[in-house]
Amino acid sequence: MTDVTLKALAAERQVSVDRLVQQFADAGIRKSADDSVSAQEKQTLLAHLNREAVSGPDKLTLQRKTRSTLNIPGTGGKSKSVQIEVRKKRTFVKRDPQEAERLAAEEQAQREAEEQARREAEEQAKREAQQKAEREAAEQAKREAAEKAKREAAEKDKVSNQQTDDMTKTAQAEKARRENEAAELKRKAEEEARRKLEEEARRVAEEARRMAEENKWTATPEPVEDTSDYHVTTSQHARQAEDENDREVEGGRGRGRNAKAARPAKKGKHAESKADREEARAAVRCGKGGKRKGSSLQQGFQKPAQAVNRDVVIGETITVGELANKMAVKGSQVIKAMMKLGAMATINQVIDQETAQLVAEEMGHKVILRRENELEEAVMSDRDTGAAAEPRAPVVTIMGHVDHGKTSLLDYIRSTKVASGEAGGITQHIGAYHVETDNGMITFLDTPGHAAFTSMRARGAQATDIVVLVVAADDGVMPQTIEAIQHAKAAGVPVVVAVNKIDKPEADPDRVKNELSQYGILPEEWGGESQFVHVSAKAGTGIDELLDAILLQAEVLELKAVRKGMASGAVIESFLDKGRGPVATVLVREGTLHKGDIVLCGFEYGRVRAMRNELGQEVLEAGPSIPVEILGLSGVPAAGDEVTVVRDEKKAREVALYRQGKFREVKLARQQKSKLENMFANMTEGEVHEVNIVLKADVQGSVEAISDSLLKLSTDEVKVKIIGSGVGGITETDATLAAASNAILVGFNVRADASARKVIESESLDLRYYSVIYNLIDEVKAAMSGMLSPELKQQIIGLAEVRDVFKSPKFGAIAGCMVTEGTIKRHNPIRVLRDNVVIYEGELESLRRFKDDVNEVRNGMECGIGVKNYNDVRVGDMIEVFEIIEIQRTIA
């Protein structure tokens, strides 16, 4: 038999190549798909397969089903049958031969050990029995010797005992008499105590019966069956169960017309409740008729004479209704007390802790202030961060005006192309990168320079150690440059100035120094504290000097952080990835963040399922000053939130939920504060046009920046209203919300999914995609400008002087005029001026030249003008003709 390849053998046997390779491996032969198979190896495989076929099944499963019928009594005496099937399943697993041998050997060894222990126990019992017999024999001999000695002594003392017998008998009789007297006294005392207890019990029972009779109706009560003889030790529920059984036994004999009488009594109510209700109704009826006044309710409970002072526990916020419940008073009383203190409130209004404390103490209650963030503080304090601090890399934020070359500068340092890949060549996210240099590691944060990203720049300044202020040498100090200086000063971080674009012919670095000195940034050569470095991101000049300046500044700051222990840091950016879920870019400040750690991040929590660096590579841990992307949070955190590693996921969840609830309460409390200055704004609210927008963006920072920019566009006439905003693609929910609120759907670097597109098409919604924030803001401005009411402007088109006035039977006074300027048109409004003062404003009724009606009369011609509803025209008056022009306004 010739050798064949394994692939051919698989085709011949009609099995897959992988299956055949696995069978060879089970037989102890390693083969790949292209290896040849000899006849000997085929025989070995065949023998292995035969052995497997001969061996019986390893597992046996027995299933058993039993069916039964259960009758369930239903309403109206009918019963319902329910089929019940019980399934039982048992699986017997055949043991491996080697395992069976091992277990048999273990059982044999155990049996031998038990037999050996039994033999040893028998021998021990024999020894103990022998020793016991010996001890008993010795004791018997001792007892016999003692009895013999006693008999001899008794014989000797017999004579003397006879003499003392009489005296002993007398003493014993006296002792018995005293014992009998003591027993008689004790019996009498017990009878007296029992009698007193019985009298006390009778007195208590009589008093209870009397109070019960006083609290009942004055009408004759129904006789109550006395069950005290057999219900002494049973509870109320046991008595009800016994009575129920008795009724069922008695009622079972004659089911029929009287079957309803055997119904069980209602739980939780007295047996007489129905009779009481009937009597109450009868009493009301008699009271109305005025015939029977005998049935009246007597209340035995007396109202407490003095107020009850309670301990009231108050959290950080509480509603007026909850405060009233805790003090056990009506809500109206609390509202009255607040009005006395000068605060107007409703029962559902949320009030703060101080106000609630004042009100409760005013009403005479003791206040206990509850610190609701105790759990949060406990979770934060339970962290092992006691290790010694070590030097860490500086966190450097690149700031400056838009298009001044921040990303290009960082791009050259990292030797990558980031700027060309960003929309419009401008940065719209915070980018976090760490760079290894010859002198150490530096972490860079690249912030946007556009005016819309103020909050993002402020966040970058707070998380940083050093700010590198990039200023273009040909452009000088610009608005965002000034804002970046203010952020750096507010954060209290040193500034290193990088004068960029130094290779341009129109570059003027001295002008940059002069302009920056006006804002407190003085170069070192002028006696200041800021280092100025001339760089060119395009040519690469001055980059090494800039890095040296950064490291020198970091050395002066002596930056240190704890490297070991549980990590803490800040969220630089966050977004929702469709495949990976919420993703947060975290800058670690201290400790080491490991994969699998439980993190608490603002309102969100979770376990770190994966960590990636800025290059997209998986990492297992991140130390201080290292930026990483983490996956596994419960939701998208807000940019700028603190990230803390905690021990217990359950406690982290509780803290996150507490923060969400607290944020909601504070938000509601803030909304309900009615301010006087908003009153007039609310009155004119209906006259203001609104541009409703549903905004979705790729990252949290962009949502925040765009929302702030759009809200700043609002004017007194047109307001921008962000109906909904979020991170991630446009969903069907967003489209439905936009349709309900008549809003524009705006997607910034995101797209709508299939279900959302269907809703958008069916509802004909306005959907707009943007990748550059300039275009978004410009188009929203244009939409708002279209809603502005146009500006009306009056333009004078003609002026006529009245030379003579004559009467017309049809129009009254007619002014004979000479057109001195422009053109007089028939259907335009006019003003009559006398001594340059407007005395009438109206319209022309007739315009004639000679006897013909004309539409217009030009400059230098005479005409007759009839003014509608005005006859007091005099010689020398001026008639001014004007037209109203609508000018479309725009938002600056």
Curated annotation (Swiss-Prot):
InterPro entries: DNA-bd_dom_put_sf, EF-G-like_DII, EFTu-like_2, IF2_assoc_dom_bac, IF2_II, IF2_N, P-loop_NTPase, Small_GTP-bd. Residues 254-269 have a biased composition (Basic residues). Keywords: Cytoplasm, GTP-binding, Initiation factor, Nucleotide-binding, Protein biosynthesis. GTP binds at residues 400-407, 446-450, 500-503. Its main location: cytoplasm. Residues 400-407 are annotated as: G1. One of its GO terms (cellular component) is cytosol. Residues 500-503 are annotated as: G4. One of its GO terms (molecular function) is guanosine tetraphosphate binding. Residues 425-429 are annotated as: G2. Disulfide bonds: none annotated. Residues 391-560 form the tr-type G domain. It is found in: Cytoplasm. Residues 93-159, 166-216, 270-282 have a biased composition (Basic and acidic residues). Residues 536-538 are annotated as: G5. CDD domains: IF2_eIF5B (cd01887), IF2_mtIF2_II (cd03702), mtIF2_IVc (cd03692). Gene3D superfamilies: P-loop containing nucleotide triphosphate hydrolases, Putative DNA-binding domain, N-terminal subdomain of bacterial translation initiation factor IF2, Translation factors, Translation initiation factor IF- 2, domain 3. Residues 88-304 are annotated as: Disordered. Residues 446-449 are annotated as: G3. Pfam families: EF-G_D2, GTP_EFTU, GTP_EFTU_D2, IF-2, IF2_assoc, IF2_N. PANTHER family: TR-TYPE G DOMAIN-CONTAINING PROTEIN, TRANSLATION INITIATION FACTOR IF-2-RELATED. One of the essential components for the initiation of protein synthesis. Protects formylmethionyl-tRNA from spontaneous hydrolysis and promotes its binding to the 30S ribosomal subunits. Also involved in the hydrolysis of GTP during the formation of the 70S ribosomal complex. NCBIfam families: IF-2, small_GTP. Belongs to the TRAFAC class translation factor GTPase superfamily. Classic translation factor GTPase family. IF-2 subfamily. This is Translation initiation factor IF-2. The gene is infB.
